[in-house]
C-alpha cells in the first residue's frame, strides 16, 4: 500500500511511521533522526505491507520548505535536486542513497507529529486520529481503489501502537525525546 508518511528505522530494524499533513513536522522529524544515525526510509511516500506490518523504502526523498532547510538543515541545501525552482516549490532532497542497504523494517509504532504545541512530548493516540493524519493526503493522491486503500490503512493502524508527538522546537530535544520514547515506550 502506497502511503504518504515519513519512516525511519533504528539499528535494530524497528521502524517508526510519521503520518501527517504538510507542515506538521514530518520532514523535520525524519531528517533530524536521520542525522542522528537512524536509517531513512522516506518522508514523502513509502510502501507498506499492511498484512505483515513492514515498511519499504520507495523513493528515499524528502520535501521541505526552503526556510526550514535554511534554518534547521543548512548543510543539506547543497543536496537539493531542484534548487532552480526555489522558492516556488519545496526543496527536494534524496537521502535514500545514504543507507541503501536498509530497504524494509517491521513497523513498531505510528507517531503523528504536531508542531507548535506549548507542551512537548509523547502521548497515546487513537486509530481514528492516526487515520486522519494519513488518509486524506494518501487517498487524494491515489487515482484508483481508494476504498480498498482506506481499509488497508485502517487495518495497519488498528494493529500498531499509535502515538501523538508534540514536537519540541529544537533538534536536540527532538532527539532526546525520541530516544526516551524508543527506550521506554516500545
Task: Indicate where each model-derived feature is located.
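Conserved glycine(s) of the Walker
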Residues: 24-26
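N-terminal pre-Walker A segment at the start of P-loop NTPase domains
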Residues: 1-2
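Glycine-rich, often acidic-flanked micro-motifs
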Residues: 6, 10-21, 35-186
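Post-Walker A alpha-helix
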Residues: 29-30
Amino acid at each position: 500500500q502506497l502511503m504518504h508518511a515519513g519512516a525511519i528505522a533504528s539499528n535494530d530494524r524497528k521502524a517508526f511511521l510519521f503520518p501527517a499533513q504538510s507542515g506538521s513536522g514530518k520532514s523535520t522529524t525524519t531528517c533530524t533522526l536521520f542525522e542522528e544515525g537512524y536509517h531513512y526510509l522516506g518522508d514523502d511516500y513509502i510502501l507498506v505491507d499492511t498484512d505483515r506490518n513492514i515498511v519499504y523504502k520507495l523513493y528515499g526523498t524528502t520535501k521541505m520548505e526552503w526556510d526550514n532547510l535554511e534554518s534547521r538543515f543548512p548543510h543539506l541545501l547543497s543536496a537539493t535536486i531542484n534548487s532552480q525552482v526555489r522558492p516556488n516549490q519545496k526543496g527536494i532532497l534524496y537521502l535514500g542513497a545514504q543507507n541503501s542497504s536498509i530497504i524494509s523494517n517491521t513497523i513498531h509504532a505510528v507517531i503523528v507529529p504536531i508542531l507548535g504545541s506549548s507542551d512537548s512530548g509523547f502521548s497515546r493516540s487513537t486509530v481514528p486520529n492516526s487515520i486522519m493524519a494519513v488518509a486524506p493526503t494518501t487517498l487524494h493522491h491515489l487515482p484508483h481503489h481508494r476504498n480498498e486503500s482506506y481499509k488497508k490503512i485502517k487495518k495497519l493502524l488498528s494493529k500498531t501502537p499509535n502515538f501523538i508527538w508534540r514536537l519540541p522546537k529544537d533538534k536536540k530535544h527532538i532527539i532526546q525525546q525520541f530516544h526516551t520514547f524508543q527506550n521506554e515506550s516500545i
